[in-house]
Regions:
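Bacterial Sec-dependent N-terminal signal peptides
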Residues: 1-24
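N-terminal leader/targeting segments and the immediately adjacent pre-domain N-terminus
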Residues: 17-111, 136-139, 249, 404-407
Length: 407
């Protein structure tokens, strides 16, 4: 009986060991730093010819915007008041992208190593550093008012310091008005705040103002927080300044240490603010970054690093077994906004009603920036697609072509 019991235990251990090995073989693949494995589509049972069609589609459906960054910014926003660029802009490249299936690169086009402005995909990085602050208890809850965390901030103004003149404009308090004191991190993240004010020389009303009487629009009654969705980069920049106030260190450093380095991103990405968005924090001069390229600045990054970030969000914040940002945060980011069900936290565009991408599953999401620059995340197909400078009306066509290769 004793021999039988020992034999049974031995078999049980052996079987479990074998199961463990099988499980390990099936574990998700995550690329190491500077070493991302490529696999031929046929190795993963993908249709190579169809993927080639998808690449051809991407290459022939380039955005019509100018390659000259300054000219493109002017063409997009030049008719707005206070539209002058105040952050870096560069010449952009042509169409580029990568297709990531089960963690492996199975196709690419253009120059994926080229560092280009990513425009409002930057907002996804901004919401991520706020999520890190929530995970660490630095922000107790997204339902807290932002004003509780932000005190008056000194603007770095060397000209004023040299002259000895200290104007009221040298100190800013972006959440001090009666309306702004009501705003929570939640409504700021969802772009339903209707924040009022001027920041870095840009009034909130000057961003994509409606046609008609501008004075009437400027002096209108403010919407209750959470009731109306409006895409507005001044408000995004106010959120970035609030996040800087919480972290008390430059947000690019926060992102680098907690997200980009752990996922093996390159050393080539940069996150810029504006020439006039420098502040003094704890005696240190630091730049408050922008949440996009509306007036220049924001994130400049290559397609591979975009893909790594997409892979992180596809796995709900987990990278090779390490939870870099909580699954709860990703769940919140993927929760539709009441005032716009196609939007979660910035800049997670949701396909809940399949209006964004009719060809894709309803549970997909896309990090989108003007250009268009996109990071498509598809958990049903274990798929991430990075596409740069794809025509806005051609996003679904590209994804449709790729999904035909996966099915």
């Amino acid at each position: 009986m004793k021999k039988f019991t020992l034999f049974t235990v031995f078999i049980f251990i052996a079987l479990n060991s074998s199961f463990g090995q099988t499980k390990a073989k099936k574990a998700d693949y995550f690329p190491a730093y500077n070493n991302w494995q490529h696999k031929a589509p046929s190795q993963l049972m993908l249709d190579s010819a169809q993927l080639n069609k998808a690449i051809s589609f991407a290459m022939t459906h380039e955005a019509k915007s100018s390659h000259d960054g300054a000219l493109s910014q002017f063409q997009s926003f030049g008719k707005e008041p206070f539209s002058e660029a105040i952050g870096p802009l560069t010449e952009r490249g042509g169409p580029a992208g990568i297709i990531i299936y089960k963690g492996y690169i199975v196709a690419q086009w253009g120059d994926p190593e080229r560092v280009d402005i990513v425009n409002s995909v930057t907002k996804s990085f901004l919401s991520t550093v706020i999520g890190l602050a929530v995970d660490r208890g630095m922000i107790h809850s997204t339902m807290d008012t932002v004003a509780r965390y932000v005190s008056p901030i000194e603007v770095y103004n060397p000209a004023a310091q040299l002259s000895g003149y200290n104007a009221d404009g040298d100190m800013i308090n972006p959440f001090s008005s009666a309306h702004d004191r009501r705003l929570t991190w939640e409504v700021m993240l969802r772009q339903t705040s209707d924040w009022e004010g001027t920041l870095w020389g840009k009034p909130d009303w000057a961003d994509r103002p409606p046609a008609g009487d501008i004075e009437q629009y400027k002096n209108r009654k403010r919407n209750d927080p959470g009731t109306v969705w409006k895409y507005n980069d001044v408000r995004v920049n106010a959120l970035a300044l609030a996040a800087l106030s919480v972290w008390r260190k430059p947000l690019p450093q926060v992102l680098k240490e907690n997200i980009m380095d752990p996922i093996g991103a390159s050393a080539t990405w940069r996150w810029f603010g504006y020439r006039n968005s420098w502040v003094v924090m704890d005696g240190q001069i630091m730049q408050s970054v922008s949440g996009g390229g509306h007036w220049g600045g924001g994130m400049f990054i290559n397609a591979y690093d975009m893909g790594r970030f997409g892979l992180l969000t596809l796995h709900h914040g987990n990278w090779n077994g390490k939870q870099l940002i909580s699954e709860q945060w990703v769940k919140q980011a993927l929760t539709p906004t009441a005032a716009n069900t196609g939007y979660g936290y910035m800049n997670w565009f949701l396909n809940t009603d399949k209006k964004l991408l009719p060809s894709a599953p309803a549970n997909t999401w896309v990090h989108i920036g003007n250009g268009n620059n996109i990071i498509y995340c598809d958990p049903d197909h274990d798929l991430v697609v990075v596409a740069r400078w794809i025509d806005n009306n051609s996003m679904d066509g590209l994804i449709n072509n790729i999904l035909q290769a996966v099915k």
